[in-house]
């Protein structure tokens, strides 16, 4: 496990200068756990928050042994200590967040607007990687532009188990929904192509949970009607431990039955089998 030293004087001064350009105050949420690294995460954020009155650090402590995280917003978090090369994209992300803007191309923003289900993007990085800051900066902006992208930046020198889990051989590596991988210095167009061209029929059940829990049955039913497919991942929500998720999926099926009775009839055998096992 690598040990991160406190920010250098030069890094702190650079951060102070960058944070002076913030237009609106913002919060950095640091989720601390019993993990041995939690103390380092706090020591990293404290001087940054002290460097600007526009940055408020909120520390939340959990009893679990889960990894600590630095959360810039609900869909963008770091399992990393972004010093050194990674400091620039981290600070730039805070600046863009404060301005509610990005530097993404208009065509990118238009395509991101078509995302309607959550997509998990894990970015594997290391402190010595020359291309990682560029990719991290791009992915962070995509997360600022679309709440449906759930981004986690992971330093594999701190969390080697993720490198083992995904058989990472080089960085940066992007892992999309725990399956597809993109390696190297990826262009904006290529990454957006990958993110926006996925078929909902292949999505994990968790990808549909956000829609169901937000009560947007009409949206999910409309997607199924448009694709003439009752997504298997969505149907699995009928057995979710969360009662509200199960009920939400029932509402989706009711909405779907009104729009396309034939489509609902096509999954009757699955529903009967499901009820038999309950």
Task: Please annotate each region the language model reported.
Residues 227-239, 261-275:
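Amphipathic alpha-helical scaffolding segments comprising HEAT/armadillo-like alpha-solenoid repeats
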Residues 33, 53-64, 146-161:
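Thiol-based oxidoreductase modules, predominantly thioredoxin-like and allied folds used
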Residues 72-101, 170, 175-208:
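Non-catalytic, surface beta->alpha helical segment in thiol-disulfide oxidoreductase systems
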Residues 214, 228, 241-244, 276-278:
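Alpha-helix N-cap/helix-start positions at coil->helix boundaries
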Residues 207-226, 247-261, 273:
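Structural detector for internal amphipathic alpha-helices that build alpha-solenoid repeat scaffolds
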Residues 2-25, 81-114, 200-206:
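N-terminal leader/targeting and pre-domain segments
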């Amino acid at each position: 496990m690598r040990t991160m030293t406190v920010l250098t004087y030069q890094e702190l001064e650079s951060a102070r200068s960058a944070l002076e350009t913030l237009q609106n105050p913002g919060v950095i949420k640091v989720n601390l756990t019993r993990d041995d690294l939690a103390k380092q995460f706090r020591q990293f954020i404290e001087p940054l928050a002290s460097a600007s009155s526009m940055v408020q650090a909120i520390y939340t402590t959990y009893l679990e042994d889960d990894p600590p995280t630095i959360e810039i917003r609900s869909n963008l978090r770091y399992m990393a200590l972004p010093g050194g090369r990674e400091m620039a994209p981290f600070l730039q992300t805070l600046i863009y967040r404060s301005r509610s803007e990005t530097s993404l191309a208009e065509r990118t923003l238009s395509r991101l607007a078509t995302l309607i289900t959550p997509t998990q993007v894990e970015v594997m990085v290391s402190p010595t990687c020359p291309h990682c800051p560029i990719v991290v900066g791009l992915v962070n902006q995509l997360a600022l532009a679309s709440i449906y992208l759930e981004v986690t930046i992971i330093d594999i020198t701190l969390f080697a188990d993720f490198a083992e889990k995904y058989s990472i051989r080089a960085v940066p590596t992007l892992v999309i929904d725990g399956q597809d991988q993109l390696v190297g210095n990826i262009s904006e167009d290529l990454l957006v192509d990958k993110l926006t061209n996925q078929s909902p029929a292949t999505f994990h059940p968790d990808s549909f949970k956000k829609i169901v829990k937000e009560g947007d049955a009409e949206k999910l039913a409309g997607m199924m009607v448009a694709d003439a497919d009752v997504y298997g991942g969505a149907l699995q929500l009928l057995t979710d431990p969360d009662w509200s998720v199960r009920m939400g999926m029932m509402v989706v099926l009711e909405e779907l039955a009104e729009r396309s009775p034939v489509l609902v009839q096509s999954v009757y055998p699955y529903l009967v089998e499901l009820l038999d096992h309950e």
